[in-house]
């Protein structure tokens, strides 16, 4: 259900938040109990004074913690028991007697008992889990005046209001942001932590049209063709999900029985991880002969093995998720099917295979990077290569945090590790690897000096990882963890904006390179997307991230469409645009000169505009306005109300959601153009010549080393 609705605010956004909804229904059941017990009437027949008296009594009653930690026993009052019974009836009707759930097939929940399950009615067991969320979100921690979730979700009838800590640390985080930006800019300028332009100098320039390539480099092209196929499928699934917000079927076709919303959501998230990661793999493989200055023995065979391993993992995991969601795969569902955790839906078997594939990639990199790191002839280049290799190792290393999540893991502990993947791995390690890889590209294309680039990378990585690691805590505000995370998460997530703000200047630098380099500079299409990467890093990851991460806003916003706006702006805007830049760089080097006609480069420029106009429309013309109205609804009626399906069916909301279609189509057109480019590139590849490539790389390295004698390290 986390790929349909949310629990503790985490999950997908079409369905309700089951914590908030269960809390609201649970309270209604208690009201009914006291109305009948005290007055012998239904609650809605009571006077306003009588109703308010019952609400006050219930609010006091649910705040009392009756859990016995020694005996591990929770005692409910008679009214709470009545509320729980009312909750059971509610969900039996919602999931069984009244099965029409938007975007889901009828009677989706089956009473089957498999691994990690206990016997009994599955709807009732699910209800018990929802009730537990309602209880921990409305019952005070022992010795505290706020609940286990720091009084989230917002619900006045439950006594859930924002704690003073949330407001206090929001103010402090804003002050830290202002101070952090000022200090970072001062340090950057004072100690010259910027990449120095080098393209004006008389230095050796790589000419991709005459550059020989090796066998393994030639084979990377198919990785990028696969990337574009996965990218296209991913956005089509996203558009199907967007359509489910406005009607249950797809223009009258009952696709929800074949591709329900939760399956589309699972695939949508998995595919973005797969295609971005595949881009990293392809880029790393291309770089190996460049740093080693020759082709490693039988490297091409390993490239093929890794490629087909990726297809097996992607196809197998998606099939397993499909069969699980349709109720076909039941036995060993957690190994081969859908485990239900957002971004980690793939079964354990596929997860281990993915880790194994990334380890194979590291082995392939080691064959080139380790010998290169031992060289003494060019120390600055060696340091840059070492940074890139360590960044690559971090990609599979930090993904291993996902193996700690098992089907019987406590939700708070499991979500703790899940955010290591969603935030620390995707937003942290991916970002760090992207920053280092960008530096390597700038140096490799002789646009910046090595020494200045290394200094700039050290500075950026210290800021990025120094704030980002602890900044993961802003995901722990309301999930049952310690209130200490309100302070740590608010402070460090604000500081995360500092390095992202500096990327505005990086974006301008890329634009300047694009404008100022000589007319026949071969990588201008790459720099178009690098420029957009910097812009979206500031807008999507930076501005929108800070907007929703401040505790005082996140308390009401958590799990609304503003979260989706941030996710699209950062994931598609940053990693999407950067991945495309990497793809275009490699393709420019491995394809023949005749492929890069003026018409081809014009098509890529069109693609860049279509992608960014479409993405901006999705984020700022649809998700942000809907999120703002949703936030207003939560403030007025309570969080549970803003997450009901009825909210999306309001006339204005429905109109805005229908208005997303043109932006989706524009974005799709941009992807299709890139798909055509990548597939055409497969038929215009250079012939591999390992000996010629080795000779050229040695010549280039010698010329580079000589040029560094005159490089001034300012």
Language-model-detected regions and their locations in the chain:
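Hydrophobic alpha-helical membrane-insertion segments
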Residues: 227-238, 306-320, 393-395, 533-538, ...
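Short, intrinsically disordered terminal tails adjacent to the first/last structured region
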Residues: 695-714
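Juxtamembrane membrane-water interface segments of multi-pass membrane proteins
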Residues: 185-195, 202-222, 243-256, 260, ...
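Soluble extramembrane regions of membrane proteins in the secretory/endomembrane system
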Residues: 1-165
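Hydrophobic or amphipathic alpha-helical targeting/insertion segments
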Residues: 3-7, 12-48, 290-291, 297-365
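Membrane-entry segments of alpha-helical transmembrane domains in multi-pass membrane proteins
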Residues: 1, 29, 115-180, 213-233, ...
């Amino acid at each position: 259900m986390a790929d349909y609705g949310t629990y503790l605010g985490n999950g997908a956004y079409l369905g309700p938040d089951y914590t908030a909804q269960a809390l609201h229904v649970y309270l209604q059941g208690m009201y009914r109990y006291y109305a009948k017990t005290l007055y012998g009437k239904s609650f809605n027949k009571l006077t306003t004074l009588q109703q308010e008296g019952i609400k006050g009594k219930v609010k006091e009653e649910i705040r009392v913690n009756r859990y016995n930690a020694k005996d591990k026993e929770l005692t409910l009052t008679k009214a709470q028991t009545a509320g729980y019974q009312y909750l059971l009836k509610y969900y039996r009707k919602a999931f069984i007697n009244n099965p029409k759930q938007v975007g889901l097939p009828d009677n989706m929940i089956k009473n089957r008992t498999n691994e990690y399950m206990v016997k009994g009615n599955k709807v009732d067991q699910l209800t018990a889990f929802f009730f537990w969320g309602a209880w921990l979100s409305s019952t005070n921690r022992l010795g505290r005046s706020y609940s286990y979730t720091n009084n989230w979700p917002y619900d006045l009838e439950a006594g859930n209001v924002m704690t003073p800590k949330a407001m206090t640390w929001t103010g402090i985080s804003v002050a830290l942001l202002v101070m952090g930006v000022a200090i970072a800019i001062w340090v950057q300028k004072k100690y010259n932590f910027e990449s120095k332009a080098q393209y004006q100098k008389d230095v050796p320039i790589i000419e991709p049209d005459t550059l020989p390539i090796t066998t393994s480099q030639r084979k990377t092209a198919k990785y990028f063709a696969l990337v574009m196929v996965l990218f296209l499928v991913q956005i089509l699934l996203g558009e199907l999900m967007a359509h489910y917000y406005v009607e249950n079927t797809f223009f009258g076709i009952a696709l929800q029985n074949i591709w329900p919303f939760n399956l589309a959501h699972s695939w949508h998230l998995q595919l973005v991880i797969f295609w971005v990661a595949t881009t990293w793999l392809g880029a790393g493989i291309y770089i190996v002969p460049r740093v080693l200055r020759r082709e490693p023995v039988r490297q091409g065979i390993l490239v093929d093995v890794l490629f087909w391993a990726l297809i097996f993992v992607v196809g197998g995991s998606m099939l397993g998720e499909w069969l699980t969601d349709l109720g076909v795969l039941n036995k060993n569902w957690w190994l081969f099917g859908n485990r239900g955790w957002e971004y980690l839906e793939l079964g354990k078997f596929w997860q281990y295979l993915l880790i194994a594939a990334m380890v194979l990639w590291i082995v392939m990199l080691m064959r080139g990077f380790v010998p290169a790191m031992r060289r003494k002839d060019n120390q600055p280049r060696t340091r840059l290569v070492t940074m890139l290799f360590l960044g690559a190792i971090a990609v599979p290393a930090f993904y291993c945090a996902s193996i700690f999540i098992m089907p019987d893991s406590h939700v708070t502990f499991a979500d703790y590790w899940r955010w290591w993947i969603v935030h620390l791995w995707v937003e942290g390690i991916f970002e760090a690897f992207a920053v280092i890889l960008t530096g390597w590209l700038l140096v490799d294309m002789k646009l910046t000096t090595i020494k200045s680039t290394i200094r700039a990378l050290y500075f950026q990585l210290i800021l990025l990882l120094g704030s980002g690691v602890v900044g993961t805590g802003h995901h722990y505000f309301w999930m049952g963890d310690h209130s200490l995370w309100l302070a740590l998460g608010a402070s460090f997530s604000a500081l995360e904006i500092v390095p992202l703000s500096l990327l505005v200047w990086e974006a301008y630098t890329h634009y300047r390179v694009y404008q100022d380099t000589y007319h026949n500079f071969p990588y201008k299409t790459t720099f178009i997307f690098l420029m957009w990467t910097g812009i979206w890093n500031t807008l999507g990851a930076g501005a929108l991230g800070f907007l929703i991460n401040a505790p005082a806003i996140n308390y009401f916003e958590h799990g609304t469409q503003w979260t989706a706006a941030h996710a699209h702006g950062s994931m598609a805007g940053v990693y999407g645009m950067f991945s495309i830049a990497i793809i275009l760089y490699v393709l420019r080097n491995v394809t023949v000169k005749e492929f890069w006609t003026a018409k081809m480069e014009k098509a890529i420029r069109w693609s860049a505009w279509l992608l960014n106009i479409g993405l901006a429309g999705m984020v700022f013309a649809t998700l942000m306005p809907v999120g703002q109205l949703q936030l207003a609804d939560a403030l007025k009626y309570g969080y549970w109300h803003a997450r009901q399906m009825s909210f999306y069916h309001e006339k204005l909301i429905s109109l805005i959601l229908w208005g997303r279609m043109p932006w989706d189509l524009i974005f799709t057109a941009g992807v299709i153009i890139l798909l055509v480019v990548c597939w055409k590139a497969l038929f215009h590849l250079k012939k591999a010549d390992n000996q010629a490539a080795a000779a050229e790389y040695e010549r280039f390295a010698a010329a580079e080393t000589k040029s560094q004698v005159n490089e001034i390290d300012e």
